[in-house]
């Protein structure tokens, strides 16, 4: 890792702020952040993170990390009239830490290369608590030399760093990860409803499931920490965001000629949860519509 690197970070939301904090405190590098909200910038200033008033102030960055809500936001920040493509120097690397369409990742790679700027998709998985602890799983799509340059920085935010292949492959794997997670949470919601209806203590049931072949990350986290407690905060991965990611998965399924009926069922349940007013709630709230 080059100790003279300048790092930019755009997007300080639920995951972005703790990732930015870890990157700053662990790397010792000069780090400048951009967000439309004042509060996270003020908090991060306490650990030495500078603030950019506009994207133009990212011009001196050697690496720029993005943690944005969706592909449209990523496209705007990268390719807009005052976007990164207009300000970054040759040799800079742009890294998308969020979940965006595979096709967009490959388009951005092509567009940035016209300006001798490199691009990598490196979407993160796990929870906000993992972002705070620096124990995220990060799935990287990049050519080998770009991955090698980024890996030391990524290890300051995550503990499991997987080079999935070329640009776009990180997004593809992350989208499949989320599709499987959403279907698992939906299955847990069904089990919870059936168990309650049949008169069993849900806590006893989930504890027993965790000791058998039904054990999973989703059971131990989304199931035990949210669904059992019937607690679905607004400062977590919302139903709206889950619906967005599931849409990316179904788009990929259509591209390869697969119906993906399980994912379609979960999409309908997310739609029901959103219609019931749970759009901003932590997505395991889907249990309330089953």
Annotate each predicted stretch with a short phrase.
Residues 1-66:
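NAD(P)+-binding Rossmann beta1-loop-alpha1 motif at the extreme N-terminus of oxidoreductases
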Residues 7, 99-178:
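Rossmann-fold dinucleotide-binding core
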Residues 31, 51, 118-120, 161, ...:
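Hydrophobic beta-strand scaffold residues
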Residues 55-67, 71-118:
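Rossmann-fold NAD(P) dinucleotide-binding segment
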Residues 169-290:
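Helical "substrate-binding/catalytic lid" subdomain
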């Amino acid at each position: 890792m080059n100790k003279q690197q300048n790092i930019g970070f755009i997007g300080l939301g639920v995951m972005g702020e703790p990732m930015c904090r870890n990157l700053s405190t662990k790397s010792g590098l000069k780090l400048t952040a951009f967000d439309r909200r004042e509060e996270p910038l003020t908090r991060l200033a306490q650990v030495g993170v500078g603030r950019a008033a506009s994207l133009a102030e990212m011009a001196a960055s050697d690496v720029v990390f993005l943690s944005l809500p969706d592909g449209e936001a990523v496209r705007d920040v990268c390719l807009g009239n005052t976007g990164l493509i207009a300000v970054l120097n040759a040799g800079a690397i742009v890294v998308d830490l969020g979940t965006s369409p595979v096709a967009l990742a490959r388009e951005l790679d092509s567009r940035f290369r016209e300006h001798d700027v490199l691009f990598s998709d490196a979407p993160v998985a796990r929870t906000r608590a993992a972002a705070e602890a620096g124990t995220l799983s990060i799935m990287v799509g990049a050519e080998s030399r770009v991955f090698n340059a980024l890996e030391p920085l990524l290890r300051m935010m995550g503990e499991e760093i997987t080079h999935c292949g070329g640009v776009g492959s990180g997004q593809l794997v992350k989208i499949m990860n989320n599709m499987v997670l959403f279907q698992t949470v939906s299955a847990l919601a069904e089990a919870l409803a059936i168990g309650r209806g049949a008169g069993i203590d849900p806590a006893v049931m989930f504890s027993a499931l965790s000791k058998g072949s039904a054990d999973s990350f989703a059971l131990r986290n989304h199931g035990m920490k949210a669904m059992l407690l019937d607690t679905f905060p607004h400062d977590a991965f919302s139903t709206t965001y889950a619906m967005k990611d599931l849409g990316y998965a179904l788009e990929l399924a259509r591209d390869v000629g697969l119906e993906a009926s399980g994912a379609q069922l979960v999409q309908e349940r997310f739609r029901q949860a959103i219609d019931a007013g749970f759009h901003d709630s932590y997505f395991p709230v889907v249990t309330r519509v089953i």
